[in-house]
């Protein structure tokens, strides 16, 4: 019986590594933009009285996530001036993408969709590109932090990233106003 308890405690020790907490948080920051582009945008356009087909076309923004592998090699090679030297290559990209997402969200909040749908969709596309670029960088940082030779930690890191992502998505869904609470 003692051996089983030791095995279970050995299994969980990988999840309590400080690197896993960082990976969990990185997963969470990857989840927030996904909900904003998806659920929030759909709700916003619906509240503005736009048609279902228009809302459906706006959903094509998600297509960016399917093609982020195309610019992943560029992310590995291009260094962000000042940030790369100060905080490192991957963290520099993450901070830059967070800044792009923040600025885009501020601009997004100032747009009336029924008056300027093209600009709204364009900024949504910028958010999606920045978010998918951030996802590339978060995954690369996770792999670098854990190390390819630590297979159990690598598996725990992948799990923590997914848990972080889903936690952010779930939390955002729970805290967003629903149709009945939108004034």
Where are these regions (language model features)?
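Glycine-rich segments within core transmembrane alpha-helices of 12-TM secondary carriers
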Residues: 155-171
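Central cavity-lining transmembrane alpha-helices of secondary-active solute carriers
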Residues: 57-79
